[in-house]
Amino acid sequence: VNAKPTPLSGCPGGIEHIPHASADSALLVFIPLPPGASLAALRLLALCCEPQFFQRLRVEQQIGYVVSCRYQRIADRDGLLLALQSPDRSPVNLLGCCKQFLRELTLCDETAFSVLRQQLAMQIRSPMNASATAVAALRQRYGLPVLTPQAVDALQHDEIIALWREMTRHRRRWRVLFTG
């Protein structure tokens, strides 16, 4: 873990093709947390996105066999990671599916927001395994945001909406890797 990253350090935006022998297409889209945004808001947004992404792209559209949307830390950046793998869709089509999902995302209402906030708070308050404890210690040591129960309790519904808008509007920050 390095010191506080600059907006382009470690994980610059852009699109990169990764050569691979498989005939399948695979796509990773990493949307970094904007500077100054709340880690708690990002984690809650990920909880909101995860089941909807799977339902829409895996169950309803049957995109392929890898369909995932979740919080992830990559190259010293917190963000939202969308992953798709398909035997019959092109990388361009997969990227279009991700963009469409984010445009049409049904953000949680106040009731669902409260449920997700409680779920996230319970995750934080539950005993951590050794790996999670080590990650939390490293984040604290390097002055990186640490997810605390207080930050989760203080979250407001409007923060999630604002974060979603910010992350989806600034696609030049996105890091896209693909095969196929």
Where on the chain are the PLM-derived regions?
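C-terminal regions of mature proteins
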Residues: 1-8, 17-20, 114-180
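His/Glu-based metal-binding/catalytic segments typifying zinc-dependent metallopeptidases
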Residues: 2-54
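Generic recognition of flexible, low-complexity loop/linker segments
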Residues: 15-17, 54-55, 68-71, 161-166
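Short acidic (Asp/Glu) and glycine-rich catalytic loops that position anionic groups and cofactors
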Residues: 21-28, 33-38, 74-80, 95-100, ...
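A structural supersecondary motif
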Residues: 26-32, 46-86
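Second-shell loop/turn segments in exported
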Residues: 42-43, 82-88, 106, 146-151, ...
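M16/insulysin-pitrilysin zinc metalloprotease superfamily fold
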Residues: 71-128
